[in-house]
């Protein structure tokens, strides 16, 4: 039995390309996180946090000085993440539909921030202070995004996505409790975030030592 022609809509190449392109934002959201299945995405705060921090890292990676080969590596990774849904779905869309999920691209996408970080680490000292400021601004944003995601997932399992945000009597909870678990996660995440934030502060200026010999 053949599945050919099950999706006649996608026999039209132009329509298929447009539909895949229209799904690009959903693919990006899926890379950031879905809880359970595709009907339970992370809260907007988490998505915005990753957009801001990840986008800043990539833009800075493209902006700093680097060799043509290094810039090409970063650009090819970005093109691979964007182009994979098109290349892998267009030949079979009419038979199986559009089945791509953003998480399928994660093995490639994880290389984007890593390569960008390598390029930034090789940049001149002129951008060092800018990088430090981005890190110190980005860490609190990511902490908020992570805590929001954990809270959202806990709420889904305790009350459902339509349930109360801060109920003290959830339909289900872990042994440590719904809000207790969220609070503990927030505490640990904030502590780790503070350690990273504190480590990224500017190094103290070297003290001037006198070149004069000691009296006596």
PLM region descriptions:
Residues 1-14, 94-96, 152-160:
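Helix-to-loop transition at the C-terminal end of transmembrane segments
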Residues 1-65, 120, 166-186:
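Membrane-lumen/periplasm interface segments of multi-pass, membrane-embedded glycan/lipid transferases
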Residues 57-69, 116-125, 194-201:
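Structural signal for the C-terminal ends of transmembrane alpha-helices
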Residues 59-79, 131-133, 203:
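Membrane-interface helix-loop-helix junctions at transmembrane boundaries of multi-pass membrane enzymes
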Residues 69-92, 141-148, 211-215:
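Transmembrane alpha-helix segments characteristic
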Residues 90-100, 160-169:
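Membrane-interface interhelical loops and short amphipathic "cap" helices
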Residues 97-117:
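Hydrophobic/aromatic-rich transmembrane helices and adjacent perimembrane loops
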Residues 131-216:
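Transmembrane helical bundles and short interhelical boundary loops of multi-pass, membrane-embedded
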């Amino acid at each position: 039995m053949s599945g050919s022609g099950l999706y006649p809509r996608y026999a039209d190449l132009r329509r298929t390309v447009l539909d895949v392109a229209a799904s690009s934002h959903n693919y990006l959201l899926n890379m950031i996180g879905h809880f359970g299945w595709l009907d339970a995405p992370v809260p907007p705060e988490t998505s915005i946090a990753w957009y801001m921090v990840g986008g800043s890292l990539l833009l800075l990676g493209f902006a700093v000085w680097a060799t043509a080969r290094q810039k090409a590596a970063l650009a090819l990774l970005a093109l691979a993440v964007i182009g994979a849904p098109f290349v892998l779905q267009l030949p079979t869309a009419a038979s199986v539909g559009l089945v791509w999920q953003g998480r399928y691209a994660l093995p490639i996408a994880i290389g984007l921030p890593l390569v960008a970080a390598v390029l930034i680490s090789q940049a001149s000292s002129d951008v060092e202070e800018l990088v430090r400021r981005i890190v110190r601004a980005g860490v609190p944003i990511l902490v908020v995004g992570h805590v929001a995601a954990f809270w959202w997932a806990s709420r889904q399992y305790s009350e459902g996505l339509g349930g109360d945000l801060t109920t003290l009597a959830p339909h289900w909870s872990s042994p440590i409790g719904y809000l207790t678990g969220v609070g503990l996660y927030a505490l640990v995440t904030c502590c780790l975030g503070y350690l990273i934030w504190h480590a990224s502060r500017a190094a103290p200026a070297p003290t001037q030592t006198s070149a004069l010999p000691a009296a006596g």
